Amino acid sequence: SIVHPEPGVWKWDRVEAFLNFSNANNIKMRVHGPIGPQSSTWAKTDSRTAEELSELYEDFLTELCKKINGNSNILWMDVVNETIDSNGNWTDKRNGTNQWENPWTQIGKNDDGIPLYIIKAFEIAQQHAPDISLIFNQHAGMQPAMWNKVKETILYLKNKGLRVDGLGWQGHLRDNVVLSLNQSKLNYLFSIIDWAHENDLDFHITEI
């Protein structure tokens, strides 16, 4: 929503500031959520066509990958973020421009029911960010319907020959609330971590 908010507009200042800071201080970084619900007002405008949305996000992700690839301090990228809701449905478009929504599902799904934007995002990242670990990042809690869909989608991508190096979870374990991960939920989290490792995936807690 900042770098490429609409066609013909590019604002790299913030990205370059982060890159310069990490390089000057030898700080390892991850690129978080380039494709997901955090989208520009232009992208969330209800009149957008699939073609317009495809062109915008493909241009953005391609140029972002080219800019960060080869930087020794950029180790990971959360290629897609918050793609599935807690009920196991694809995070979708909502009316208007002031809501938390994912406009990219309007691009469509393939014959297997997988959103095209997810597949294309990993294709672009695999081609243009070969030096970076590619992560499928997810939010919410320990809802089995959601995690089953996450697992199915990751395995689908891998079976299609796409590189998925890790699974990320936004833990949001804030110290100002009672942690909701009781023993049952902790055990479920452990099972997700085990599943990731069994399928040659790193497991990251990406937001503490």
Region annotations inferred by a language model:
Residues 1-135, 139-141:
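Substrate-binding cleft and catalytic face of glycoside hydrolase catalytic domains
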Residues 13-24, 103-137, 144-208:
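Glycoside hydrolase catalytic-domain groove-lining segments
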